[in-house]
Amino acid sequence: MKDNTKDSGEELINIDEKGNPIEKENQEKKPKSNSFTKIIIAIILCLIISVAIYFFFKCKHKKKTVFDETTLKNLKLKNRVFFGPISHTAEKIETIVKNDVALVITEGAVVGDYTFSKLQPEGPFRIDSDEYIPEIKKLAEIAHKYNAYIILDLVHQGLISVEQPVYSPSGGKGLINTEIDSKPMTKEDILRIEDYFVQGAIRAKKAGYDGVEIHGAQLTLVSLFSSKKFNKRTDDYGGSDENRARFIVEIVKKIREAVGDDMIISAKIDAPDKDNEITESGFITTGKLLQEAGLDLMEVSGPNPIRQGEDPFFYNDTKKIAEILKIPVICIGGIKKYEQADYILKNSNIEYIAMSRELLKQPDIVKKWYLNK
């Protein structure tokens, strides 16, 4: 066997098939060719990765528009415009949904301890008995007829009740009928009223609604628990931010267990408010706990739904919580123009805008926006 080295320790010399030595210069040509190929492949891979990253971030950060089609859980929405809840508007829903609103949130439907008197001549919307299912079912059928979706707002009147029984977290006078005293809620009252909300959600599902909203704003009963002014409790439902949120969180959990995963569960909560001692930390904590409890959608309002100041008046608080939560958030309050809606969507994580009074004034405003955009 022929040795291809001169002596031990000397440089290894390769030979060709005929036994002739291969010059060192020729030996180095192949590695150079391999290195060049590897460089080209690396450049191509870098270009592919760069293009992929570019399109990923372009899609991820694409500016939202009013007329985007979106998916809310299992709902395919035709745009980002909702009709927000406002009292005594059930008969106007058809006029609104046939003009291209994507989703309707009804006026508050009382879940229990219903009261009525001459102080409320029209009376509130009701869902505290199965006998009201046929009535509310008509609204769901109207919404679906026009390719819109509908959510039933569930409310307990609390201190805005005008006759007994009047319940509150810690007692006090009524807010509408100031001559009556409210009853501080016992644990049994809390559990009973939580079940009222659950039964209301079950009835909404039977009536064909796409979801329900827990009304936890505007000084209704659930709203009062978030307020240090009205909630002086020292048990599990008062004191800390987490405890003040417990009532609405338990309602959401129980509703989810009762109606399953397909139904949308939304909540309307109060923005921070100095006069009613609703803190920013409480506002944020409530949002986080509701998200953990299985909430699908959130709307931000306030103890006083009609605020003074620049429109849209809940935008800053809504923007803040939308940056923290992963669930979609609705901005409502004082939105009247396309430019406002467009700005809100393009400059925040807010997913949807809702109008109430403006849609009542101009039921075809969404169509006008589309034609003039």
Annotate each predicted stretch with a short phrase:
Residues 6-9, 34-36, 51, 267:
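Compositionally biased regions
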Residues 26-40:
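Short, low-complexity patches enriched in S/T/P/G
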Residues 52-60:
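Juxtamembrane cytosolic interface motif at the C-terminal end of transmembrane helices
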Residues 1-26:
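N-terminal targeting leaders characterized by basic, low-complexity, disordered sequences
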Residues 4, 29-31, 46, 55:
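Compositionally biased, low-complexity segments
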Residues 59-373:
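Flavin-dependent oxidoreductase catalytic cores
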Residues 42-51:
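Core hydrophobic alpha-helical transmembrane segments of single-pass membrane proteins
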